[in-house]
């Protein structure tokens, strides 16, 4: 269970660019 359902959680570029998913 990570941010955006990706292993890197919010540290990945996609999640940094889409912070609202957190």
From Swiss-Prot:
The cysteine framework is III (CC-C-C-CC). This is Mu-conotoxin MIIIA. One of its GO terms (cellular component) is extracellular region. It comes from the Eukaryota. It is found in: Secreted. Disulfide bonds join 3-15, 4-21, 10-22. Mu-conotoxins block voltage-gated sodium channels (Nav). This synthetic toxin potently blocks rNav1.3/SCN3A. It also moderately blocks rNav1.1/SCN1A, rNav1.2/SCN2A, rNav1.4/SCN4A, mNav1.6/SCN8A, and Nav1.7/SCN9A. sodium channels. This block is very slowly reversible. The modification Pyrrolidone carboxylic acid is found at residue 1. The keyword Secreted applies. It comes from Conus magus. The keyword Secreted applies. Expressed by the venom duct. Belongs to the conotoxin M superfamily. Keywords: Amidation, Disulfide bond, Ion channel impairing toxin, Neurotoxin, Pyrrolidone carboxylic acid, Secreted, Toxin, Voltage-gated sodium channel impairing toxin. GO terms for molecular function: sodium channel regulator activity; toxin activity. Negative results: does not inhibit Nav1.5/SCN5A and Nav1.8/SCN10A.
């Amino acid at each position: 269970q990570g941010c955006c359902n990706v292993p890197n959680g919010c540290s990945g570029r996609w999640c940094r660019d889409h912070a609202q998913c957190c």
